[in-house]
Each structure stands twice: as structure tokens, then as C-alpha cells.
Amino acid sequence: MLCRLGGRWLRPLPALQLWARDPPLAPVPTSGAKRPTLPVWAVTPVSAVHANGWYEALAASSPVRVAEEVLLGVHAATGLPWWGSIPLSTAALRGAVTLPLAAYQHYILAKVENLQPEIKTIARHLNQEVAVRANQLGWSKRDARLTYLKNMRRLISELYVRDNCHPFKATVLVWIQLPMWIFMSFALRNLSTGAAHSEAGFSVEEQLAAGGILWFSDLTAPDPTWILPVSLGVINLLIVEICVLQKIGMSRFQTYITYFVRAMSVLMIPIAATVPSSIVLYWLCSSFVGLSQNLLLRSPGFRQLCRIPSTKSDSETPYKDIFAAFNTKFISRK
């Protein structure tokens, strides 16, 4: 039985063509009423932080200044109050930057998923060849196992190169989205505390103090009702659960990561209750847009529009499936 791999053939022993271009197998080595008090880190002017502190360096960095100018520019161009311009800026940035990257992430992961049957076939043939060679050369089980793992990693890497879908490429979204989230958060912190690197810094702080709506009318103060922080935690947990509901048979590492993200989602609630409402409003809008993008990228029509390859795990009714799984896990269970 032959298994084609990028122009190379895997043949049963004794041919061992698997290593035709490599050395032979060998064993491998091992206001008014008292305003809620902000924490020191949220209100201390940048100049008051230790001269060599990382916090000062980050708050005064060029990316944070750019984020400040983006927020000020959107606010000036639209004429919206701050409670409207912050969500608009968030949606625009997430739509222009993270949505394409999220689509690319799904594209890579779909190609990796479609490689799994071929990888399983290669693993079976390789395991047979290593077993025969180990018997011929008298390798120990440990040496045979290490040799199998080394060559399996090499062959999988060749598949990723062939199809241009190395899984690390799927992490580019995190490396862009997380810094952007941090820079925008620091920019809003600077604007809300008068520490903005702009001549209009203090006037912006005054605008933010009167630029809220409903129960969070002062965007420079924490939300005294905790409605924004709790809403943030709920949306973040909802994102986590939707992702988990779509997975079957998670590994132990994936399970640990899921518990960690759940814990961080809950921990963000008391943290969000101590920072200016402008920051929490940004966090809430960012999470809501993230949830919307997550659902959008499950749409068969949108996936086809983005040229994301079809996979065995795709569903024609993804939203109905999510609702059914959610109902089974959290509502209908006894």
C-alpha cells in the first residue's frame, strides 16, 4: 500500500523510502456625592510613576499616543458624545483589523483540520516502519519511540509547508488583538485622568466627565452600579462557552486553558469595577464585537465568502446547533 506525500512515497519496509533524502534511521538522543475612589494605578499621573517603571513607559509609549489620537479623531470627526464615539471607535478597529485576522485564523485551522486524515495515515505507516526497523536493529522501546516522534514531527512539518498552513499562523490574531486592547485601554486611562499626551488632555477629561449616559454619566469614574463590569464578565463567559460547545473531546491542556479563561473572565469583573467607566465601556464593546465576529464566522455563507475551506466539523445550521448544545448543557440538564 502506498501513501503519497508531496512527491515522496512511503513504502513498507525494507525499502524505507521515507528517508530517501535524509540519513538512515538511527536512535535519537533526549462628583456630588462622593465619587467612587479610583485605585492609585488608575489615577496617578504618568509623571508621578517611577521614572524607570514599566507602567510609565507603556502609558507614554508611541502606540498609546496613536490610540489617543484615534479616539480624539473619531470623536471630533463624528461629533458624537464620548459614550457613542468609544463604541464606534471600537467597532471600526475590530472590523478593520481583527475581523480579517479572525477569518484568516479560521482559514488556517480549517486547512489543518482537513490534513488530519492524511496525518493519521502517515502515522500508521511510519509506526509500522519504525517497528520493523527497531526489531532489525535491536532498538529499545524508548529509542524507537523517540525516532518515531522525531520523524513524525518532520513529516507533519512538511505537510504544513506543502499546504502553507502552519498552526502558528493562526495565532497572529492574538499577537495583534491583545496589544491593541492594551494600548486602547491605556489611552482611555490617560484621557480619563488628564494624563493624555495631548494639549487637550484636561479638556478631554472634563468632556469625559460629562460624556456618559444613563447610570454611567461620568466616564472618568467607576460604574457604581457594577452593571458594566458584570455585563463584561457575562459576555466574556458567553464567548468561552460558545467556543467550548463547538469542541468535542478536548485535550487536558485545552481543558486547563478553558478553566483559566473562565477564571480570568470572572476576575475581570472586580477589576472593571475599579477603573474609569470609559475603559470598561471599551472593554464591553470590544467583547461584544468579538462575540458577534465569533458568531459571524460560523455562518456557512460568510465562511464561503471568506474562502474558508469546508471541513468535516462544519454545520449547515451552526446557530441552531449552538442553541441546542447550550440548552442541553445549562438549561435542560437535571
Curated annotation (Swiss-Prot):
<keyword id="KW-0812">Transmembrane</keyword>
<feature type="transmembrane region" description="Helical">
    <location>
        <begin position="225"/>
        <end position="245"/>
    </location>
</feature>
<comment type="function">
    <text>Mitochondrial membrane insertase required for the translocation of the C-terminus of cytochrome c oxidase subunit II (MT-CO2/COX2) across the mitochondrial inner membrane. Plays a role in MT-CO2/COX2 maturation following the COX20-mediated stabilization of newly synthesized MT-CO2/COX2 protein and before the action of the metallochaperones SCO1/2. Essential for the assembly and stability of the mitochondrial respiratory chain complex IV (also known as cytochrome c oxidase).</text>
</comment>
<feature type="transmembrane region" description="Helical">
    <location>
        <begin position="264"/>
        <end position="284"/>
    </location>
</feature>
<dbReference type="GO" id="GO:0005743">
    <property type="term" value="C:mitochondrial inner membrane"/>
</dbReference>
<dbReference type="GO" id="GO:0032977">
    <property type="term" value="F:membrane insertase activity"/>
</dbReference>
<dbReference type="GO" id="GO:0033617">
    <property type="term" value="P:mitochondrial cytochrome c oxidase assembly"/>
</dbReference>
<feature type="topological domain" description="Mitochondrial intermembrane">
    <location>
        <begin position="246"/>
        <end position="263"/>
    </location>
</feature>
<keyword id="KW-0496">Mitochondrion</keyword>
<dbReference type="GO" id="GO:0051204">
    <property type="term" value="P:protein insertion into mitochondrial membrane"/>
</dbReference>
<keyword id="KW-0472">Membrane</keyword>
<dbReference type="InterPro" id="IPR028055">
    <property type="entry name" value="YidC/Oxa/ALB_C"/>
</dbReference>
<protein>
    <recommendedName>
        <fullName>Cytochrome c oxidase assembly protein COX18, mitochondrial</fullName>
    </recommendedName>
</protein>
<dbReference type="InterPro" id="IPR001708">
    <property type="entry name" value="YidC/ALB3/OXA1/COX18"/>
</dbReference>
<comment type="similarity">
    <text>Belongs to the OXA1/ALB3/YidC family.</text>
</comment>
<dbReference type="Pfam" id="PF02096">
    <property type="entry name" value="60KD_IMP"/>
</dbReference>
<dbReference type="GO" id="GO:0008535">
    <property type="term" value="P:respiratory chain complex IV assembly"/>
</dbReference>
<keyword id="KW-0809">Transit peptide</keyword>
<comment type="subunit">
    <text>Found in a complex with TMEM177, COA6, MT-CO2/COX2, COX20, SCO1 and SCO2. Interacts transiently with MT-CO2/COX2 during its maturation. Interacts with COX20 in a MT-CO2/COX2-dependent manner.</text>
</comment>
<dbReference type="GO" id="GO:0032979">
    <property type="term" value="P:protein insertion into mitochondrial inner membrane from matrix"/>
</dbReference>
<keyword id="KW-0999">Mitochondrion inner membrane</keyword>
<feature type="topological domain" description="Mitochondrial matrix">
    <location>
        <begin position="285"/>
        <end position="334"/>
    </location>
</feature>
<feature type="topological domain" description="Mitochondrial matrix">
    <location>
        <begin position="189"/>
        <end position="224"/>
    </location>
</feature>
<feature type="transmembrane region" description="Helical">
    <location>
        <begin position="168"/>
        <end position="188"/>
    </location>
</feature>
<keyword id="KW-1133">Transmembrane helix</keyword>
